[in-house]
């Protein structure tokens, strides 16, 4: 019984460590890109596999400058991201900007925008899995 | 005894290897393993999509509301904030989480107005709550020490506060306490709304009133997020409170046209749809009444 408890505890600890790697990736690799901007307090990072796609609806205030950073772990192919309005009108795609991970923009008025993120499927023999993080920062 | 410990460790190592294959931050799996999983692929994909919905969520930070209050020329009012002395009276995870968010918004407000001593007090209260809730990430002694060192630099304090709360949010999400994270964010939003409403009432037709009206959109994001959690009792009370606020905010009229993308003189992309949020005075009064009532319930 004691042994089982030890195994379970050890596994829980390992699970936490592996999940925490996304937080470390975000802190060390992603957040330095927000230099000069005040970081948004929401945390958006998760493990993605090739072919995975996700979307987040965000509200941006009018008159402010924003920076959006979308980055994937280097083991993944270049992460694609798009910014769309609520009618699904495409406003920006990093595919048209040499797969840049940073997008700077200014809001003329307050508006909800969607950020769609995709890890392309390379079709290779190996299926890669890694952290993908979306962070936003603002400045006046 | 040694053999027993070794055999237990071996099991741990083997299972850890398996877990690393499924959940490391950057790793590979061979596609040879996939056919056996194909039958379950659709349901697994759906489960992953649902899981991602619970992680990927974003609303503006309370600091954005606080900075507008300062920009509009208003002064700091300590009396508006939740008392730090109340921290020991908050029992139960839901109430503690909401107040952790409320203290976070108060902290942002104090930071924007350069209230360094107040920041230290509010950070200490937030840390106390985080400790009571067994949250080790984000708010800890090292952050408190960092904050003490940065007493003279407002931007650094702001950076410490926002990154501490973002890290706390990340810690909760990574430790399967996503509901607690939702409550912390809701508490922060509620407090920022309360502070903005107080200033909006003092002013006449200011930008703050418009910003309050725009919370109709932010609340829609927040409630969408709540709908990704299937019947979690810990969220029920806050969800019904948010719905009560939404009932009033639904009276706000938002007009918008087609979104345009232009380039400013400095080369930055400008996005806009000419949207305008308008709120009548009686709606603002009704909003203040309901927000005050809900806030009082959580802070007392």
Write out the residue ranges for each language-model feature.
Chain A
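Sec-dependent N-terminal signal peptides
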Residues: 4-14
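Sec/Tat signal peptide C-region and signal peptidase I cleavage site
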Residues: 14-20
């Amino acid at each position: 019984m004691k042994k089982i408890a030890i195994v379970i505890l050890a596994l829980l600890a390992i699970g936490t460590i592996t999940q925490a790697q996304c937080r470390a990736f975000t802190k060390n690799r992603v957040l330095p890109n927000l230099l000069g901007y005040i970081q948004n307090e929401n945390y958006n990072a998760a493990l993605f596999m090739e072919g995975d796609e996700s979307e987040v609806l965000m509200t941006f205030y009018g008159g402010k400058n924003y920076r959006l950073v979308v980055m994937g772990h280097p083991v993944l192919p270049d992460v694609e991201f798009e910014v769309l309005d609520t009618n699904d009108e495409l406003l920006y795609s990093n595919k048209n900007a040499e797969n840049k991970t940073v997008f700077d923009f200014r809001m003329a008025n307050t508006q909800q925008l969607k950020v769609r993120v995709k890890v392309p499927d390379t079709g290779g023999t190996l299926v890669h899995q890694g952290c993908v993080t979306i962070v936003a920062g603002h400045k006046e | 005894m040694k053999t027993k410990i070794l055999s237990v460790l071996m099991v741990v190592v083997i299972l850890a290897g398996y877990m690393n294959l499924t959940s490391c931050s950057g790793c590979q799996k061979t596609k040879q393993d996939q056919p056996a999983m194909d039958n379950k692929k659709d349901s697994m994909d759906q489960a992953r999509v649902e899981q991602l919905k619970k992680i990927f969520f974003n609303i503006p930070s309370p600091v954005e509301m606080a900075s507008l209050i300062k920009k509009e020329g208003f002064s700091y009012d300590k009396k508006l904030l939740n008392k730090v002395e109340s921290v020991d009276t908050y029992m139960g995870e839901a109430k503690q989480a909401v107040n952790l968010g409320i203290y976070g918004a108060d902290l942002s407000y104090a930071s924007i107005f350069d209230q360094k001593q107040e920041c230290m007090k509010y950070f200490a209260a937030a840390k106390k709550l985080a400790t009571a809730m067994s949250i080790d990430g984000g708010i800890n002694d090292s952050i408190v020490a960092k904050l003490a060192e940065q007493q003279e630099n407002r931007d650094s304090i702001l950076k410490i506060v926002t990154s501490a709360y973002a890290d706390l949010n990340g810690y909760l999400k990574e430790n399967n306490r996503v509901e607690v994270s939702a409550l912390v964010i809701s508490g922060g939003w509620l407090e920022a709304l309360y502070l903005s409403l107080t200033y909006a009432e003092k002013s006449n037709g200011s930008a703050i009133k418009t910003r309050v009206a725009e919370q109709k959109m932010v609340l829609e994001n927040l409630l969408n997020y709540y709908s990704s959690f299937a019947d979690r009792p810990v969220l029920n009370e806050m969800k019904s409170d948010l719905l009560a606020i939404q009932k009033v905010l639904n009276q706000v009229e938002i007009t918008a046209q087609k979104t345009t993308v232009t380039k400013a003189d400095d080369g930055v992309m400008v996005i806009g749809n000419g949207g305008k949020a308008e709120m009548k005075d009686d709606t603002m009064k009704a909003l203040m009444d309901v927000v005050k009532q809900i806030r009082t319930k959580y802070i007392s």
